[in-house]
Design a protein with these regions (language model features):
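Gly/Ser/Thr-rich active-site loops/lids in small-molecule metabolic enzymes
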Residues: 122, 200-202, 254-274, 338-348
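N-terminal small/polar loop signature for handling phosphorylated ligands or for N-terminal nucleophile
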Residues: 41-109, 190-250
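Proline/glycine-rich low-complexity loops and linkers
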Residues: 78, 130-158, 162-164, 251-323, ...
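Short glycine-rich phosphate-binding loop at a beta-alpha junction
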Residues: 39-47, 71, 173-175, 276-282
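Phosphate-binding and adjacent anionic-ligand microenvironments
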Residues: 274-436, 442-459
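Gly/Ser/Thr-enriched, mixed-charge loops and adjacent short helices
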Residues: 110-230
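An N-terminal, well-structured beta->alpha segment
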Residues: 1-61, 65-66, 91, 149-172
Length: 459
């Protein structure tokens, strides 16, 4: 078995090169042994990738061979698999789910996002599973029985239609780009039931992603949506990744970063008389933390959807946000990343404000210049050692180095300077260091960038 498929947050590989039916069956066998300790059943769904159903059958056969009953959720967005584990479906209560998805990765990728007893199965859990599988031998077997089909999609939609009934007849038309992922399957029926006017691009699930890559964190993938909004005079738009757990929001003159969405959501909670408690990640802007801290409370934590779900549960914060568009609501919801739910929460902003009001809220924040996220190629073996050496070097920085106010080491190195910060962290999923810099203006941000990268080069 190719050990490269065992990542920090999930299991992910290239079909059929590093992840195939044989490995899916073996993973099912050993994962089933772990899952049956808390429940004898599991919900399993898949996204639109062309190999999803092949992996579903092999994984399910492995799970069955370990004594688990498999419930077949079919073609669904990832949040629906989470919803099944947290809420139950049609009287079936089961805290385990597996979503077969390649998320926002290229079409040849696929993998497993695992929920065990309503918690993400990640990090040490995945590494322990890998160690077990390296010493195990399994002969692939067919399904013992056809998994029972369960309509989780309709149950999910009923839940959200009820929770967002106050959005009925929203006065704004919205534009949506689903990138040929599975998001439209979940969201469009909800919008129709609420009589919200919308116009969709690429709503048909197609695992070949013929129009553009389904990653809304890349500006180039938003071009079609921007053009569609301009041509049709639509003031607000949303884009989703392939499995609908990440969102991007656009208005006529602005693309909202994840930390800007966090500010808007926190301000609405505050306006409702709630003192918001918000968790951000190390890549979020200092402006976000400073702004929310004027009327609420923030906590900075590690990047990664599994990390933030666990921290949200621990702290009972209202919500958490990542720059990449993962938004996790605990207030009124279950605390997992759901881009379709986040879209509906964003539409609530329009009950009291116009799209231009939202733009003005962001424009009126203290100005800062932030560099794009950049990747530095390093070997998988060296990346964490490099970060460790950088942390040591910063304890005694060069004399010409900008004044350091604080060093935050929860995830890589975030160096807080007088007028901004510099971040260098090891990616948990790829052989790269990831960097990001912020300053009171472009000159300051680039000064911080030069200083940190020069120090990095000397290590």
């Amino acid at each position: 078995m190719d050990i490269s498929i065992f990542r920090e947050y999930d299991i992910r590989g290239i079909y059929p090169t590093t992840l195939d039916e044989k490995s899916a069956f073996s993973i099912g066998v050993e994962l089933g042994k772990i899952m049956r300790e808390c429940d004898k059943s599991v919900f399993v769904g898949h996204d639109a990738r062309v190999h999803g159903r092949f992996l579903f059958e092999a994984l399910s056969a492995g799970l069955q061979s370990s004594g688990l009953k498999v419930y077949d959720l079919g073609l669904i967005p990832t949040p629906v698999a989470y919803f099944a584990a947290f809420n139950g479906i049609n009287g079936i209560q089961c805290p385990n789910s597996i979503m077969i998805t390649g998320s926002h990765n290229p079409k040849e990728y696929n993998g497993f996002k695992i929920t065990l007893n309503q918690n993400p199965f990640y990090g040490k859990d995945i590494q322990a599973l890998k160690d077990t599988l390296l010493n195990a031998k399994h002969e692939i077997k067919p399904l013992k029985e056809t998994p029972e089909k369960v309509n989780a999609l309709e149950a999910y939609q009923r839940y959200l239609i009820k929770d967002f009934k106050h959005l009925k007849n929203l006065k704004y038309k919205i534009a949506l780009d689903f990138g040929n992922g599975v998001g439209a399957l979940g969201l469009e029926p909800i919008l129709k039931a609420l009589n919200i006017d919308f116009s969709s691009l690429y709503s048909d699930p197609d695992g070949d992603f013929p129009n553009h890559h389904p990653d809304p964190s890349e500006a180039k993938n938003l071009k079609d949506l921007e053009k569609h909004m301009q041509e049709n005079a639509i003031l607000i738009g949303f884009a989703f990744d392939g499995d609908a757990d990440r969102i991007a929001m656009l208005s006529s003159h602005h693309i909202y970063a994840g930390d800007e969405l966090a500010i808007l959501f926190a301000k609405r909670l505050h306006a409702q008389g709630i003192t918001p408690f918000v968790i951000g990640e190390v890549k979020c802007s200092q402006v976000m933390y400073n702004t929310i801290n004027t009327f609420g409370k923030t906590l900075m934590y590690k990047t990664g959807h599994s990390n933030l779900k666990i921290k949200l549960k621990e702290t009972n914060a209202h919500f958490a946000a990542e720059m990449s568009g993962h938004i996790f609501f605990k207030e009124r919801y279950f605390g997992y990343d759901d881009a379709l739910y986040a879209c509906l929460r964003a539409l609530e902003l329009l009950l009291e404000q116009s799209p231009s009001d939202l733009e003005n809220t962001i424009k009126n924040l203290p100005y800062s210049y932030t560099t794009p996220e950049e990747k530095i190629a390093v070997s998988e073996e060296e990346k964490f050692e490099i970060i460790h050496n950088l942390q040591k070097a910063l304890k005694n920085p060069p004399s010409h180095f900008p004044t350091i106010k604080e060093i935050i080491s929860i995830d890589g190195v975030r160096v807080v300077f007088e007028h901004g910060f510099g971040l260098i962290r090891a990616s948990n999923t790829t052989p790269y260091l990831v960097s990001r810099f912020e300053g009171k203006d472009e000159t300051t941000a680039l000064e911080y960038k030069r200083a940190l990268l020069n120090l990095l080069e000397k290590l």
